[in-house]
Amino acid sequence: GFVKPGPRTDKVGAIACFEEKTAVISNSQERYNYSYTPGSLNIFANEEWSYNYNAFTEFQYPWDFRNVIFNPQNSAEIFITSWMGGVFRVENNVVVEQFMSENSPLEEYYPHNNYVSTSGMAFDKANNLWITNSKCGNLLKVRKASGDWLSIQLPYVSSEEGVVAEWILVDRYNKKWITIPRSNKLVVYDDNNTLDNLTDDIVRLVDLNSAANVSTQQINCIVEDKNGNIWIGTDLGIKIVYNSSNLMKNPIYAKNIFITQDGYTQNLLEHESITCIVVDGANRKWVGTARAGLFLISESGTEEIAKFNESNSLLFSNQINAMNINPVTGELFIATASGLMGYRTDASEGREDYSELKVFPNPVRESYTGIISVSGMMENALCKITDANG
């Protein structure tokens, strides 16, 4: 079904979901250029939308928002990156702080202008916030859980003016994956769990094309699945790095995934530009594309389960710009070129216990032939449905 009413704008750039909250930010969809689009934050909670359109107007360069993230230890705290205005910190829907070059190690695009271009964000296991800072010398910044900052230079990546570090992923082994889209690079950074000691850090460059069947030129998105594998959305389909704890000891290669469709074997979505990938509670992949709509892919990526586009569904547009999934309800939020949609999937995240177990309908009458929904289960639980006699 659709989420209505929705956010203040139909130009949705990024979506964050945590617990039962969803945060949506506006964006012009300009990937690297300045568009001066006013930023806004919209919150969906308790089946209602709330927003404060003028919340950012008193701050420097509150335009061209890029990403949004909840603090996993405090759902009332939200961080937002901006392609011009650094990083904003929001508490209880109020902007309380802006991080720029004057009050943090974040760097300006000097000498061209004093904009601070930030994009990707991710929290690590110690609740340190990792941020990509483009068009400057040190492309990686860390705001520690203590509030102190750290600035890190990445090898393999030129610090020339204009270089872009876009997205960052912190995986289950606490390694950081940073995308450098313009030069088609993917950097893996391991701080060896000694954040303040830069001398023991290990950095590797992922070889995106040598072991792949399709040569790609640009990385658009990156996500880790429930098996620890890294899925990479590119300009020509999807590639995967099969992750492991000793990954940093060997060369790292990305590979294509074979899928059999209509009797033919081909590389997964090799003709599509992949804009976003979301992993649901069943480890399936929801894949957004630039012009072909939305795909649901099996856990391994070898089977296409469903396809949604303007012709066969209520999808607003075949251009999918961003997605995220509510881990509690399983609702998939889809940002299209024509606005935001919500789709209720049939898979949510496993719970830590059975305290919120729900069955609908309950009781199930003998004449009922529809779907039975069971929610609030633990991961990998076995569910059996019987009649009163067992």
Q: Which residues does each predicted region cover?
A:
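Surface-exposed loop and turn segments in beta-propeller and other repeat-based domains
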Residues: 1-8, 48-63, 94-114, 150-161, ...
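Signature of short aromatic-glycine-proline-rich micro-motifs recurring in repeat-based ectodomains
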Residues: 7-14, 62-68, 83-84, 110-122, ...
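Short glycine/acidic-enriched loop and turn motifs that connect beta-strands
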Residues: 29-33, 85-87, 136-138, 183-185, ...
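Short loop/turn segments immediately following beta-strands, especially the blade-tip
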Residues: 47-49, 92-97, 145-149, 189-199, ...
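Blade-level signature of beta-propeller repeat domains, shared across WD40, Kelch, NHL, RCC1
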Residues: 237-239, 318-352
